[in-house]
Regions:
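Intrinsically disordered or highly flexible coil/loop and linker segments, enriched in small
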Residues: 33, 100, 129, 176, ...
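Active-site cores that bind ATP or allylic diphosphates and position pyrophosphate for catalysis
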Residues: 77-79, 85, 122-287, 345, ...
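Residues forming anionic-ligand binding surfaces in small-molecule and nucleic-acid pockets
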Residues: 63-70, 226-232, 295, 302
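Glycine- and acidic
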Residues: 38-46, 71-78, 230-238, 301-307, ...
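Long, charged, mostly alpha-helical binding arms that flank functional sites
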Residues: 264-344
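Core subunits and conserved enzymes of cellular information-processing
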Residues: 243, 247, 251-253, 318-321, ...
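N-terminal Rossmann-like or analogous alpha/beta NTP/dinucleotide-binding catalytic cores
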Residues: 2-152, 215, 242-269, 274-276, ...
């Protein structure tokens, strides 16, 4: 047995391994593939990565990192009609954002088109593949069912010479798309439907974004994938559970390709459960539909489960990776509660985000006994969770804004915010008491009058007296306007994919986006916020600066509220 030079570091040894990591550890201990470990992440460049893909590549890169191996990034670019460099660049950006790097190990399935074509020619010459002229519908009809065998194609017994001639002409562009396919000749009575003479090549006349017009025939996933793994020296091909029935075909083609060298090196396919999340969809087709029909504002809409959407919303790489680690990898499909992801970002931003004051639905408060021209600078903690986070200054004056919901003229007994005749504390400032309010002709409150106690400034002895309510606020004279986009869950139902009675688009949450045009923010925030920065708006939630921000007006996206409001609704 080859000596295994790849060892777990001491920290990892102390952790319990998931089943994929255990398989890898056992293979390395047994000296398989010369004690090497090489994984790969093989996305198709035909869309943006979502959090489900992140679970996959966190495993691919993570297990390689854990055991001192390597992980390749290989684009499965076998369908030129749907692929684009835009997606390629976005995929690479998202992987790097989560903290992974493939180094010089960037590959494409198209790197192996000649080798795959040569392998197909070899199979034809050995009588193991044939050209079929039937339509895809006819071929599907002949496949049979899991309990009844399929029917052999009338073209199954063509001569090697005829098959070689037709396949060569297919690649020369002599035939239209859909007119001919190359099928592996295996067993139309096999219990495994994937063994019933699977299609391994089809005609696509669209130019390829890397190879141009060189090829007119392109390999199917089952034919390209395992062989690409073999060409690259991949030892562990990790994928999701829907590929379990494909594994025997993966192994068959690899063994055909490797021949008598299969005992020296052979990649192994391992499957784990995919990530399914409540209140969203993971289907690339459905997500594309939402984008194309304008039901969301692009792939990076902060309501989308795409990594670029989560990034724009304010999710951090650490929160996503922690969530993925917490839900784990198993062999059983499950629907994961989105509240676990939301908890992960709350936990992360609680440690990292500076606290600031912003008033989303403002009403003016006039402190009638405070000098009109006086301005005091109040010292506000940036983040009490961090010892060295420091403080910032916030101006206080006679007129301030508070949240309209923080005032009630006729309040019930357990209302501890502002109401006439009761005291409340202004965060970092004074204790004030409401003395009255002004209304317009429709009965809407336009102004609240209060008095303050000058001996209750935060830090003074008078500030210690018991007051139940504490409100956030901003100076009316010094605050700036900002746009705030309050995002919520994309769908109104827990599992939109399971609802067979409704079109999934009819299940969208109509309250998933509310735009507040003129929220009031404190000067410190207005002067220091940069695109992507994350803050806690005190008593409201976590927000980040959006890319639509301008020098004149900042735009903030709500990442998540301070508390899970959905759990309360669901308990009702």
């Amino acid at each position: 047995m080859a000596e295994n030079n790849i060892q777990l570091n001491e920290q990892e040894e102390k952790k319990s391994l998931n089943f994929v990591q255990q398989i890898v550890a056992d293979d390395l201990a047994a000296g398989k593939n010369g004690g090497r470990l090489s994984t790969r992440f093989p996305p198709e460049p035909n869309g943006y990565l979502h959090i489900g893909h992140a679970k996959a590549f966190c495993m691919d890169f993570g297990v390689a990192e854990m055991f001192g191996g390597t992980c390749n990034l290989r684009f499965d670019d076998t369908n030129p009609a749907k692929e684009d460099t835009e997606y390629e660049q976005a995929i690479m950006r998202d992987i790097k954002w989560l903290g992974y790097d493939w180094g010089d190990r960037l590959y494409y399935a198209s790197d192996y088109f000649q080798q795959l074509y040569d392998f197909a020619i070899r199979l034809i010459k050995e009588g193991k593949a044939y050209v079929d002229d039937q339509t895809s519908e006819q071929i599907a009809a002949q496949k049979g069912t899991p309990t009844t065998p399929g029917q052999e194609s009338t073209f199954r017994n063509r001569s090697v010479e005829e098959n070689l001639d037709l396949f060569t002409r297919m690649n020369a562009g002599e035939f239209p798309e859909g007119s001919h396919v190359l099928r592996a000749k295996i067993d139309m009575a096999s219990d495994n439907m994937h063994f019933r003479d699977p299609i391994i090549y089809r005609i696509i006349l669209s130019p390829h974004w890397r190879t141009g017009d060189k090829w007119k025939v392109y390999p199917m996933y089952d034919f390209a994938h395992g062989q690409s793994d073999y060409f690259e020296g991949v030892t562990h091909s990790i994928c999701t559970l829907e590929f379990v029935p494909h594994r025997p075909l993966y192994e068959k083609f690899v063994k055909e390709l490797a021949g008598d060298k299969v005992d020296e090196y052979c990649p192994r396919q391992i499957e784990f459960n995919r990530l399914n999340l409540t209140y969203t969809v993971m289907s690339k087709r459905k997500l594309l539909q939402l984008v194309k029909e304008g039901l969301v504002n692009g792939w990076d809409d902060p309501r989308m489960p795409t990594l670029c959407g989560l990034r724009r919303r304010g999710f951090t790489p650490e929160s996503i990776k922690n969530f993925i680690n917490n839900i784990g990898y198993t062999k059983f499909e499950a629907l994961n509660d989105i509240s676990l992801l939301e908890h992960s970002i709350r936990e992360d931003l609680n440690k990292k985000a500076n606290r600031v004051c912003a008033v989303l639905n403002p009403v003016k408060v006039v402190i009638t006994n405070y000098p009109e021209d006086k301005v005091e600078m109040m010292e506000m903690d940036n983040n009490p969770e961090q010892e060295n986070a420091g403080t910032h200054q916030m101006p206080f004056c006679r007129e301030i804004f508070i949240e309209r919901d923080d005032f009630m003229e006729d309040a019930p007994k357990k209302f501890f915010r502002m109401t006439p005749g009761k005291e409340v504390r202004l965060k970092g400032a004074y204790i004030i008491m409401c003395t009255g309010c002004t209304k317009d002709a429709d009965g809407n409150i336009t102004e609240i009058q209060c008095t303050y106690d000058p001996d209750t400034l935060s830090g003074m002895e008078g500030a210690n007296r018991k007051v139940k309510g504490t409100l956030h606020w901003v100076s009316a004279r010094h605050c700036k306007d900002a746009e705030v986009r309050v995002y919520d869950r994309l769908f109104a139902v827990e599992n939109p994919s399971a609802d067979t009675e409704h079109d999934f688009r009819d299940l969208l949450n109509p309250e998933s986006l509310k735009v507040i045009e003129n929220a009031k923010i404190e000067p410190f925030l207005a002067e220091n916020a940069k695109e992507g920065d994350k803050f806690q708006f005190q008593r409201i939630g976590y927000f980040c600066v959006d890319q639509d921000s301008t020098a004149e007006k900042l735009v903030f996206n709500r990442t998540i509220g301070l508390k899970d409001s959905w759990s309360k609704q669901n308990k009702k």
